Each structure stands twice: as structure tokens, then as C-alpha cells.
Amino acid sequence: MPCTCGNWRKWIRPLVVLLYILGLIVGVPICIWKLQKMEVGVHTKAWFIAGIFVLMTIPISLWGILQHLVHYTQPELQKPIIRILWMVPIYSVDSWIALKYPDIAIYVDTCRECYEAYVIYNFMIFLLNYLTNRCPNLALVLEAKDQQRHLPPLCCCPPWAMGDVLLFRCKLGVLQYTVVRPVTTVIALICQLTGVYGEGDFSVKNAWTYLVIINNVSQVFAMYCLVLFYKVLKEELNPIQPVGKFLCVKMVVFVSFWQAVFIAILVKAGVISNTWEWKRVQDVATGLQDFIICVEMFLAAVAHHYSFTYKPYVQEAEEGSCFDSFLAMWDISDIRADISEQVRNVGRTVLGRPRKMFFNDDPEQNEHTSLLSSSTQDPISAASSIPPSPSGHYQGFGQTITPQTTPTAATIPEELYSADSPEADLQVADHSKVSDDSCNHLDS
């Protein structure tokens, strides 16, 4: 039977549950046999206990991902959500493998850390796509707001101009971590092969010390840009309850990083000195970090299940292929296009050329064109854009509405632009009305 059959949403979930049960039937006896065969020590016990948490984590995460695929009604919002949800199983399985095989821990851990940069970027895209749908004139909304000063510790820096400048710099601040992290990962792998990496050892002779500093500065600035972006547009983002989502992303990224640094400090101070079955005390630190992550990912899976729930997107979906839904999850053409666009904008700035305006009079040409254009959309995105109205916009609290008209850039009545009209005086007197009209026209 072809995968495009209309009832695939009915059998895909039981199939996944059945496959997981079969995996347990095969995997658990193997783990028990392995435990009995080997000499049971601290390393083996830690690996077995961590495996129990992995087995509890994966079904929770995969169930949330599967539900989003079944109810894939708003691709521009659900695609980044699915990418974020994949963080938990990737972290969990990666850490479990690294715990079992310490010799390859450096390689699997660096791949895991690269994905965290990808997650931060996709969370930013999720917020931007929601705001773009709800407020097509997002730059106008920002310009109508009071000037936002920088947050500590950058409060002494000149503020970023409200409008497309702030949008560009916040997005670039997040995007730089997506580029810096893979670059430092490649450098770390090269240093490991040449024997100068020294993971977990704070020393001026080891490359690990410098890469940790670079990654930390890049990561902190990316999270700072996210916080600043949220603070400026807090009112507009309230319907999707972003605080819980932000905390889920921030806690996984920050806690995993700082606990690795804290464990390395304990090793350096001599608090952790016993090696047990490991070869070096640094391997003990890496194994402890991987074990803790396996436990933490179970808690993160539960938090992600409720924070990034599929329920607001449950509605009558268009008939589509399960194969297309699956491929849409892996499509990264929007990321490639967005990175290329940001690199070109940075190049224009460095060369002193005028940067391309993101939010101009043409609603088809803006900062998110590369993200939402037909050339980079997945098949499900293209299918959802066939009707004249959008596929629906997340308004929060489990409610999804479908506007009857297509939003355009002309969301403010023309009389507001007339200097002779009384509405124009009202517009000058109260700039906040522009923001309300621009963001609430889809709710009417």
C-alpha cells in the first residue's frame, strides 16, 4: 500500500509503539547479558543505570515528534519545533554511547554540542516565524516602541536602533553561534588527533582551555540576543507562552555546558581523583558528565513534551504523504539560505555598502523571504500555502484560527498616513496603536 494513503495518520503511531516494544524486547536482554558477562564495576553500573533513563527518555521525545508530524498543519512553526525536540534523544543516546566507549567520547560529544547551536538558532526562527505571521510589519511595530537599552552586562553599550537594525543584530547574534560552534568542533577534533586537545584539563598548553572560552563567549552572546529579543517583543510573544520554551532550551544548553566546566574544576582541584575502571581522571570527568546528561534528558523530555506540545496545531489537515512529512523534518534548505543571506549582509556592512532592508514596502521581500519562500519550502509547506489564506496561526492556549484573508503589509489604514486626517494626529500621539493594529489585524 503506498505511503500516500489517506489513513497513514491512523497506523503510524501504533507502528512506532510496536517497533519500540520490539526494541525493548531485544535490547534489554542484551544489556542484562552484557552486565552479567562483564566484571561489574562503577563504570558498568553507571552505563546500565544511564541506559534505563535513555529507554524512558526516547519514547517521550519520539512521541512528541510523531504527533507534530501527524498534525503537521503549520510547517513554518512546527519545523523548528521538531528540530528542537530532536535535541533530547540526540543528547541522550550520544551521552550513553560516550559513557560506554570513553575512547570515542570526544568525537560523539562534539557532535552533540554542535546540535545545541542548531537548537538555539531554530528557537530564534520559531519566534521570528510566529511574529512574521502575526505581525507582517514587524519592523514598524518595533519602531513604534520605546527605545530598548542593553541588558547587563552590556548596559553601557549604545542601544541598537529599534526596527530592522535590532532584528538583524539579534538574529546575527544567534546565528554566529551556529557558525562558531561547528568551527571550534572541527578544531577540537584536529587538536585531539594531534594530541594537544587535553579535554577537561585547564592548562595554557591545552587547546581545550581556549576553545571552552571561545564557545562560552559565543554561547552567552547568543543567549543574550535571545533574551533581548524576547524583552523587546514580550507582549507580542505572550500568546505562545515563550518563557517555558525558552527555559527548556536554555536549561539544557547552559546546564550541560556549565556542569562540564564545574566537573573539570573539581578534577583540577583534586576533588575527583579516583579513576575506577577509567584510564585517566579526565575520562572519569567526561563519564560523569555523560551519565548526568542521560539522567537530565529524562527530565528534559518531560518538560519538552508539555512546553512544545502539538495540541495547538490539531486541526483538519490537508491530505498529504507521510513520506513528505518525514522529509520535511530533515529539510535544512531554509538554514542554508538564511546563513547565505546573513553572510552577504555582513559583507555589505564590512565593505561599507548599504545593507539590504529587511522590512520594506514589498511584503514579498523581507528578512524572512529566505526562510519562507517557495524555493526553500518543504513539500508540506508548499501544500499548505496553496489556499489564499494561511494555514492558521498559533494564538496560544490551545486555539488555532484560520484567517479568511491573506495578510499583507498594508495593515495600517491609509488615512493614518495622511497628515490632514485626525487619525494621523492620534497616531503621532500614541505610537503604541501602530503596534496593536499591526499585530492584531489577523485576530479580527
Swiss-Prot record:
| Bias type Polar residues, positions | 368-378
UniProt keyword annotations, A-Z: Membrane, Transmembrane, Transmembrane helix
Name of this chain's protein: Transmembrane protein 184C
Localization recorded for this chain is: Membrane
Q: Compositional bias (Low complexity) at which positions? A: 399-411
Q: Which SMART domains match?
A: Solute_trans_a (SM01417)
Underlying gene = tmem184c
- Per the annotation, which location comes first and is thus the protein's main one? membrane
Q: Its membrane topology, per UniProt? A: Multi-pass membrane protein
GO MF annotation list: transmembrane transporter activity
Q: Name one Pfam family in it.
A: Solute_trans_a
Q: Region Disordered: which residues?
A: 357-411
Record field: transmembrane: 15-35, 46-66, 84-104, 182-202, 210-230, 252-272, 284-304
Instruction: Answer whether the UniProt record assigns the keyword Nucleotidyltransferase to this protein.
Output: no
What family does the Swiss-Prot or TrEMBL record give for this protein? Answer: Belongs to the TMEM184 family.
Q: Which GO terms describe its cellular component?
A: membrane
Q: What does this protein do?
A: May play a role in cell growth.
